[in-house]
């Protein structure tokens, strides 16, 4: 059985050779994530090249995702590099530049003294250390430590419930975005999305560079959950980034947000990734915990297009074992025919109705596959959200679309020459499927396409076709 749910792997020091990246692809990586929170541009350029070379060598479509750091709020530096804040003591966070001491340290967020008020919470290092604001004195925010622990240079700070006035992208993000676009990545992930309007800032940079690619909204902030439907509509895909989300929201709400985000994304034919701590223990151990295996399984059961590995593959000790373990868990869950909640959404668009119709025809006629010709990937994504048991085969003349469809559930993509007629389409299907060795002459497939071919948004055709027969 072919795995349908895709796997996203973060590249890093543990995968910093061409052989390691090729092993990742062979183990099951569908999309490579370049994390711009770490590494230099030269590191990302090297990884980009390795992924493209591995994709060409293996014949597998592999997408490349550039994940922007976002305007992360951090502490400054301590004179001694670190300290330990005890529960109950008072510390000061200042917007002034200073050499950090045990009692007073700076922050990169220069509006903190303006935005903070008594009772606000600050969480340091993904919530490991908790503070509550006592008062604001000039440029200093006086806090009481509610949960003590070690703190060190440049640790991240979350401000749950505080209406922070930071832009959607920092200067670093803009530079990284321009670099990633010129490099040729297939997706951009925007961190700390709060509003559907955030995508417009990304598009403005893309238009300046002269290249648009799909933008993924990372759901990490309470404001994103409040604006969830509008954000799903505005962006091209979403990522349920459970690390920061679990700091900003009560932990018990995160599983419900995950399920809701997946459902809304499926209704709108937008790919959805579930990320963070999926097999975290495998950074150090060769086997995951039972809870982690269940977590991966539940993301599949919820209907996610993809599951993501972060530190497990970027710095972990058991990189290939982790990817192979995730692939095995996914495949085991996918053998359950009732694994995904059905979509109650009723399509109202032409392509939506055609995709539902093609799925129904294919399943009722016991077709061997659904085949979609696409210029943009949209029709394929509309088919992918239905999670049909039939193989979903996409044909496109565009290399970037082939790579982008590596993120979509259950999709196997073929790069083909442009065609001028539907007869040429059917010939391409016959040639490609017979060459695979998995299909035979006379097998029934259902083809979705646009006539005339080659025009974005022209999908208007469902054709029931027998491979190798002159029904065209």
What are these regions (language model features)?
Residues 1-472:
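Non-catalytic helical/linker scaffolds that mediate oligomerization, partner binding
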């Amino acid at each position: 059985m072919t795995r349908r749910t895709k796997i996203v792997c973060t590249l890093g020091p543990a995968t910093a050779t061409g052989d390691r990246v090729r092993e990742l692809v062979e183990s099951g990586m569908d999309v490579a994530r370049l994390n711009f929170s770490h590494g230099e541009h030269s590191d990302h350029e090297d990884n980009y090249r390795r992924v493209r070379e591995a994709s060409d060598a293996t014949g597998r479509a592999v997408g490349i995702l550039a994940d922007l750091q976002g305007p992360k709020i951090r502490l400054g530096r301590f004179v001694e590099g670190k300290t330990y804040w005890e529960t109950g003591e008072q510390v000061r966070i200042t917007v002034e530049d200073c050499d950090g001491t045990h009692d007073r340290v700076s922050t990169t967020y220069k509006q903190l003294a303006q935005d903070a008020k008594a009772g606000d919470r600050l969480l340091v290092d993904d919530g490991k250390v908790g503070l509550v604001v006592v008062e604001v004195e000039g440029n200093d925010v006086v806090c009481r430590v509610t949960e003590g622990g070690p703190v060190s240079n440049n640790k991240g700070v979350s401000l749950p419930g505080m209406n922070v006035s930071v832009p959607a992208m920092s200067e670093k993000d803009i530079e990284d975005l321009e670099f990633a676009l010129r490099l040729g990545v297939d997706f951009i992930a925007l961190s700390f999305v709060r509003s559907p309007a955030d995508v417009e800032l990304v598009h403005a940079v893309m238009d300046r560079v002269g290249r648009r690619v799909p933008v993924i909204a990372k759901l990490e902030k309470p404001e994103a959950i409040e604006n969830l439907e509008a954000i799903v509509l505005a962006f091209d895909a979403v990522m349920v980034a459970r690390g920061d989300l679990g700091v900003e929201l009560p932990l018990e709400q995160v599983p419900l947000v995950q399920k809701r985000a997946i459902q809304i994304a499926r209704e709108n034919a937008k790919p959805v990734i579930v990320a963070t701590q999926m097999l975290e223990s495998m950074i150090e151990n060769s086997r995951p915990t039972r809870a982690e295996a269940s977590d991966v399984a539940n993301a599949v059961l919820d209907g996610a297009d993809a599951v993501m590995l972060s530190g497990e593959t970027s710095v972990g000790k058991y990189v290939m074992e982790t990817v192979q373990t995730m692939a095995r868990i996914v495949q085991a869950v996918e053998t359950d025919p009732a694994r995904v909640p059905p979509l109650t959404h009723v399509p109202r668009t032409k392509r939506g109705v055609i995709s539902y119709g093609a799925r129904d025809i294919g399943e009722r006629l016991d077709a061997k596959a659904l085949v979609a010709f696409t210029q943009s990937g949209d029709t394929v994504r509309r088919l992918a959200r239905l999670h049909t048991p039939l193989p979903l085969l996409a044909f496109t003349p565009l290399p970037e679309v082939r790579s982008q469809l590596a993120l979509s559930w259950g999709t196997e993509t073929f790069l083909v020459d442009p065609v001028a007629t539907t007869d040429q389409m059917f010939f391409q299907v016959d040639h490609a499927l017979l060459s695979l060795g998995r299909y035979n002459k006379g097998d029934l497939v259902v083809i979705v396409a646009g006539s005339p071919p080659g025009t974005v948004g022209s999908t208007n055709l469902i054709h029931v076709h027998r491979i190798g027969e002159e029904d065209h």
